[in-house]
């Protein structure tokens, strides 16, 4: 077996059970991985230096093909209503079949960390079949210093083999695609998907399982900090604006997707950003645009001009879920440590497909827990396989696919931290205004940024507020720089009766969805539910 690169001499492939490999490339750097990816025909070089790869049939995550091993340890800890399960025996068969499938292959291995806080991180070793996948995960997680590698000991091992096809009858799974998570043995097996995001979300899933037991809140959120160190968290599903809104030139970026909150502050789980690039423009998102075509960036399913190799970010012919993965330090004002103090503001982002929610609302602590547990948004086109048009959905904790434990575990942690640190909470609609999806328009990003600036600098707290008659939260009556009517959703609709009916429909959906949580929350949170306060027109 041929081995190249640097690793701990006592932590080779045999510690995971791999055998008869043709070779392993350990902890290769960006130029080395570029050379392998291009030589193997996995990817092409874009004009500005990015590495462009296509993922084939899987252009998003496959949440229905993710299974957690149900054993004596996880039986009482995992939220089985939300997580598919396989037996330890089925996992062992799958594991042995993965090892057999790897024989004769040359793999790429990266020794990395999930978590910027040494007290709460996990050492994740990732074996990949593709060189560009190795570059992706090296970009997205946090790297040890080169001199640390000889002493590195993995605590979690991921093996990513897109060529592996699962057998539903043999392995107890749904299709030939598989993401198998074993919390007890600390292993993740990924097969038959080339979508690189599966790897990073597998590390996130592990941290979401492990950290609550330590009193640390894992969060599907972006985070940034003002010049005075005031931290803001942005919760939201993919496509709701976490990456875009946290990349603010006036604030220091901690990260765009995954963070932890301990008693010492907030820390990023990752070392990179994974930005949606469909219709990305230099004018609207200059920092992300600049980061998305330079050496070290991976472009996923982005079309390149046939002759010039210039990326066409307007071309969604492969998928609407085009992506750019780049190191955090490609953003000029990114935090070098990925760590900061406790939050001052929490922003819950929703892409309201019905177009009836205001662009911003202030939440009480009880309302914040209610909306966190509800996780209302829209599935935005292409983020998951099979989703082309936005559709209303409730994803608890703004990240149900990645939350192994019951939502109340995360909700109670969040409520306690909000109360302890007196955090201001806001709901921001980055979705539709002037009508539902297909009729109205997407909320202008300049409106959202103006409102966010007012919330984060404290000036919005001095505004006059009114109570929304449908949802009960507080909405500013006027904000400098914002056209007044946009703060009143009903005034943006041509048909007021249609607005009323649509708002009532959404209120009913909220209440129906929350019924499953009512036994897990106190009276204050139950009373924070939307209640229509006006008679039908």
UniProtKB/Swiss-Prot annotation:
User: Which molecular function term from Gene Ontology is one that the record holds?
Assistant: ATP binding
The cofactor binding remark recorded in the entry reads: Binds 1 Mn(2+) ion per subunit.
Give me any GO biological process, just one: gluconeogenesis
Q: Which UniProt keywords apply?
A: ATP-binding, Cytoplasm, Decarboxylase, Gluconeogenesis, Lyase, Manganese, Metal-binding, Nucleotide-binding
Spell out the GO cellular component terms annotated for this protein, sorted alphabetically and separated by semicolons: cytosol
Q: Which residues bind ATP?
A: 201, 220, 236-244, 285, 323, 448
Please list the coiled coil stretches: none
Q: What positions does the entry give for Mn(2+) binding?
A: 201, 220, 257
Which Enzyme Commission numbers does its entry carry? 4.1.1.49
Q: Which CDD domains match?
A: PEPCK_ATP
Main subcellular location of this protein, as a coarse class: cytoplasm
Pathway info: Carbohydrate biosynthesis; gluconeogenesis
Q: What does this protein do?
A: Involved in the gluconeogenesis. Catalyzes the conversion of oxaloacetate (OAA) to phosphoenolpyruvate (PEP) through direct phosphoryl transfer between the nucleoside triphosphate and OAA.
What is the protein's name according to its record?
Phosphoenolpyruvate carboxykinase (ATP)
